[in-house]
Regions:
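Transmembrane alpha-helices and adjacent helix-loop boundaries
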Residues: 1-229
Length: 229
């Protein structure tokens, strides 16, 4: 196509995937794992009969779900160094870096969404199963760990994966703190070689292929879970 040079993509593939996509996938996996763990804890807090705990978790979830992600990224990027200085009793802000700030941001932000998913999963389990656990001599935490959470997690796997696809796409926002994710790496190449259309078109195709492929996996899981039920 006249005026376009798509060879720049081939020349930059190594950098884009070695540095950019590795950053994106690693951040996605870490934020997914830690976000689900923290989100499950938040879900249990929201379902707690102790009202102050339930209200605290609810306030956190509502706060995170009401603020644009890009603002949360900025907030943690500039705030975490001061929190680190306070914890370590340092006179100056602690140097944290874009990577750690991104991990903390996405863990804290996505936990609010994973919380609501896990809360729905826990509430979908028949109350009788909880009482059965107590009848067997299990305490609350054992009942949740051995009976309720495994079933809730299995039921919610498709929804959790759907949220993870959104998380994968949202990681592209870390470019605002100069992190070199897949989009950030493409932006550097685009600005260096003045090939914005070519690079951003390629990035869009890659995100579409990965996200659409994962959505097909989610659909297949939903069908399998429906059959098991």
């Amino acid at each position: 196509m006249e005026g376009f040079d798509f060879n720049v993509i081939e020349r930059s593939l190594g950098y884009l995937f070695r540095d950019g996509m590795t950053f994106t996938v690693t951040l996605t996996l870490i934020a997914m794992t830690s976000g689900i763990i923290f989100g499950t804890l938040l879900a249990m807090m929201r379902l707690s009969s102790f009202r102050p705990v339930s209200m605290l978790a609810g306030a956190y979830v509502n706060l995170m779900r009401s603020i644009p992600l890009v603002l949360v990224i900025f907030w943690f990027f500039f705030l975490v160094p001061y929190i680190g200085a306070w914890i370590l009793r340092e006179p100056q802000p602690v140097r944290v870096g874009a990577w750690l700030s991104a991990v903390i941001t996405f863990t804290m932000f996505e936990a609010a969404y994973y919380c609501e998913i896990m809360r729905a999963g826990i509430q979908s389990i028949a109350r009788g199963q909880v009482w059965s656990g107590y009848a067997l001599g299990l305490n609350y935490w054992q009942t949740m760990g051995y009976i309720v959470l495994p079933q809730a997690f299995r039921n919610m796997v498709p929804v959790l994966l759907t949220q993870t696809i959104i998380l994968f796409q949202d990681t592209s926002l870390v470019y605002v703190i100069s992190a070199t994710d897949f989009l950030g790496a493409a932006a550097k190449v685009a600005n260096r070689d003045y090939r914005l259309v070519e690079m951003y078109s390629f990035v869009a195709v890659v995100y579409f292929v990965i996200s659409y492929s994962l959505s097909l996996v989610v659909k297949r899981l939903q069908e399998r879970i429906a059959i098991i039920r």
